[in-house]
């Protein structure tokens, strides 16, 4: 099955500039969390459009493979939170059903729908939800991750690492697989995970904006780019930058943006 409306053998975007490396060199850099998911229903066209208009050059995307093989932009494993009154599990529900559901400002989007319309200078911070936060051993979830890797490789002309930043969490072991594919990896951490974390396995380190100065000092000492999450107003942004964050994962495009 082709994941894109284009011929699967034809790259959507040719390999070119390393957009990810250039993006991470900015101070500060901004990533739109869940495509503006606090101001707008998460992962919808409204939030995507608002994020791009606000000047974001990176979008954070959670994806899950649905029953018919498409990767759907959704954080949760089922639809009950984002579409009240429904209870579809993403993994065993086909896109033909999911596409009929409506959140407050529109329907769900597939990863292909997003890639088809974003400019070539946009970084996609992709979180493959079933493998990003644990030592996943389920063959189906690992196969879905492999399918996603292959799709991105074709879509971005053999060099997806130039457009995609791979997102994981402290307990996720997918970083090794992503690094083997050439990706830079961003890990989102919480204060109680810092002491036991090996920063060397990641390229970008995320932390709650409200974490104490001692926590941020440890992150900054790594010499790696850092990103504060989840920012929804100017006060939080200022505090995060004062603690040394080099990037902001912001979720309210009209208030916090580049």
Regions found by a protein language model. Name each.
Residues 1-258:
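Phosphate-group recognition and catalysis centered on beta-loop-alpha active-site segments
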